[in-house]
Structure formats: C-alpha cells, structure tokens
Amino acid sequence: MKPVIALVGRPNVGKSTLFNRLTKTRDAIVADFAGLTRDRHYGNGKLGPHEYIVIDTGGFEPDAVTGIYKEMARQTRQAVAESDVVIFVVDARAGISAQDYDIANYLRKLGKPTVLAANKAEGLPEGTQVSEFFELGLGEMLAVSASHGQGMRMLVDLALAPLNLPDPAEETEQEDPAVIKLAVAGRPNVGKSTLINTWLGEERLVAFDLPGTTRDAISVPFEHAGQKFELIDTAGLRRKGKVFEAIEKFSVVKTLQAIENANVVLLLLDATQGVTDQDAHIAGYILESGRAVVLAVNKWDAVDAYQRELLQRSIETRLGFLKFASIHHISAIKRQGLGPVWKSIIQAHASANRKMSTPVLTRLLMEAVQFQQPQRSGVFRPKLRYAHQGGMNPPIVIIHGNSLDHVTESYKRYLEGRIRKEFDLVGTPLRIQLKSSVNPFKDKE
C-alpha cells in the first residue's frame, strides 16, 4: 500500500508548488464535498524507489473557530489523520511566525512522524536557512526550494524513512490468481454501503482482516457462483460480530489505495445526480492505474425516461474514456439488476489477463495496415512490422517498426479497436506502445 504524505503549513509558504514537484503532475483527485470552501488535493508521486500519495491542504490555523479558516483547519486535520507522515512547510525567507508555533504545537501533540521543510531557501547562505526553525522542536529539518526543485529527493527520503518501507525490489506479494480482488468506488452517498451490505447479506460473509501494515484496507473474502472474490474496503467496513457491515464513510485515500490494490473496480454512479467532477476524477484515476472497470448506475428506479436519457449522454460525454467498460443500471436498495454486474466483473478480469500470441497479433497488425495505412507525415510514412504482448492487467501490446513517432492518436485508437474485437477485450484498458527501430543514418549527413 502506498504511504500517504500530508503537506501542512500556513498560507503562502509554497505548499501547492511543493505538491506539484512531488507529484510531477498538474492532475489531482479533489475531495469536493458539498459545502467545502477549501478542498484537499490528492496526487501520486515517485521520487526514489517508493511510490506515495501526497495530500495538499489549505493554509492551516489550528485555533481558527469561525468562517473559512475554521473549515480549512478541519480539512487539514482530516488530511493529517489520513496520512502516515507530515511535511510541515515553512517560509525560510520570512522566518518563524506565530502561526508556525501554533502548527508546531499541534503536530507535536499528535506524535505523527514529521519533517520540517524550510521552503524558498534558494540563494540563502547555507547554515542560516533552517537554523532558527530548530525552536519549533520538530526533529528532522531540510532547506528546500520547491520552485527550483532543490532538495526534493532528500525531502521524500527523510519523510518516508520513519515508515521502514520494504524495498520494492524485494517486496513480493503472494496472490491467489483464482481470487478476484474487487473494489467498489464512488462518491459519498452513491450507494456503496447499500450495495456492499446487500452482497454481505446475500452471501452471509464471514470477514477477517488480512495481514499487513496499519495502512492496509480491510478485505473481505467471499464466493459468488463458484468464483472467489476479495472485497477491498472503500465504504468504511466495520466489524459487527463475526461479519462486516458497510457505512457511508468516504475517504479519498482509502479509495485511491483500494483502486491500486484491486484487480477490478466497480465504479458506482448516482442516477439522480448525473456524472459529477468527482466521478470523472475517480474514473480517470482508475484508467491511469490500468485497472479493469465496470460501471453501475445506482438508483435507476428513481429517475424518469427523460433523466435517464440525459444521464446516458452525460456518461458518453464525461466518461467517454471508459467506453470499453460495461454499463449496468441497478437499484442496490431493491436488489434490482445485480446479477449481470457479477458477469461483467468476471469478464473484465478475464479480459485484463488475456494472453495474446505474437503470431496472431502480428497477423492482426498486417491486416489492419492493409485495410487502412497510417497517415503520412511529411516525407515519413510509419511502417508497422510486428507486434507482441508486453504485459497483462492491463494488457499491453508493443508494436515495432519505423518512424512510429509519426503514428497519430486516431490511428492508435483504430488499432486498439481491431485488437479489442479480435481478443474480445471488454472492461479493461488496453495500452499500445510503439517502438521504432534505430536508424543508423539519422545523425549522419
């Protein structure tokens, strides 16, 4: 499970710039709950051997009691609670402020691993950049410059050191290939808990906590129609006697970790609310993670024909990048439409692990090129020579040839469609990688 790092500090110390450096992306999952005046942003990153999740927060005033500052303080406390380690960001140029003392006192009481990052330290004399911040009494300190990218790797190493993470090269996870690891993802109140409790009740599940670190999500083993599953908690599973029941407790971190840990993700939408920004964010994360996915539109019984048509258009427009996924219309509370969902989950898992032989892929490639050649780019016309499988879950197809950097995205989509049809790939992303042969005369006149 990826460790979680929370960025905490008063306003304008450079937390967002640091967030962008640590994640190397402008994209983020946003906890856009109704009524929030300041969102928490979540992003993936990897500096060094370990991947991690970073939470960016607003300016923190621990003692704020009214208005926007109270809400921002609550958001920051939630981020800290979700995290494994805190990076406390201060302004090396401005020096210590009263707010810094308040935040340091708050963090010290929590006892959570904390690293102090003195940001904006570029150009300051070495040795004076962090010296005064020793007064805050928070242990490890480092002078960094988020805007210049200075000290980023060392900062991550310091932050993750207390967690004693295993070496990724040595970390081996024994998985039963016969078990499908399933995560039910979705916004708050779309019906995840209702659906999961329906399954729990139907299957009379006996649950247990799988061994692992304290960051591991609770997993529930069960069997449906002879197929073994492992349900990964995203809805706040709570033990009730010998079984678990789900409560509607939304956690972005738990959702991201569950998606990463799953073989198949069931993305639940609310028919009464349409496709929201957060639905699209979660769907994008599922695609980015390469997970097989099934879409289920809950509360279908609560909308009329006109609303259903609008919803279908919304799915096509906002979730068009998941057009390979099966869509089901269900009512979790009435237990309607749930049977076909299981069939699609199993089909998506099988597609994600489909083996594709090199001869068949190469024949398919030649037929595709014969039917429609790639577009010429200036004097270059890409030549596609052969293809082979480069991985599974998600399936990866590697195509070799010449001048492949001139292959258009539309042509890649054309090839993807041919491959999907040939191998019946439903419910899984398909990644196509193009590898051009080296031209020995490229740099010679």
UniProtKB/Swiss-Prot annotation:
Keyword Ribosomal protein: no
Binding site for GTP 2: 186-193, 233-237, 298-301
PROSITE patterns cross-referenced by the UniProt entry: G_ENGA
Disulphide bridges: none
Residues binding GTP 1, per UniProt: 9-16, 56-60, 119-122
GO molecular function, one term: GTP binding
Family annotation (SUPFAM superfamilies): P-loop containing nucleoside triphosphate hydrolases
Gene Ontology biological process: ribosome biogenesis
UniProt entry keywords in alphabetical sequence: GTP-binding, Nucleotide-binding, Repeat, Ribosome biogenesis
Entry-linked InterPro entries: G_ENGA (IPR031166), GTP-bd (IPR006073), GTPase_Der (IPR016484), KH_dom-like (IPR032859), KH_dom-like_a/b (IPR015946), P-loop_NTPase (IPR027417), Small_GTP-bd (IPR005225)
Residues in EngA-type G domain copies: 3-167, 180-353
Pfam family, one: KH_dom-like
Function description: GTPase that plays an essential role in the late steps of ribosome biogenesis.
Family: Belongs to the TRAFAC class TrmE-Era-EngA-EngB-Septin-like GTPase superfamily. EngA (Der) GTPase family.
NCBIfam families from the UniProt entry: GTPase_EngA, small_GTP
Protein name: GTPase Der
Organism in which the protein naturally occurs: Polaromonas naphthalenivorans (strain CJ2)
Gene: der
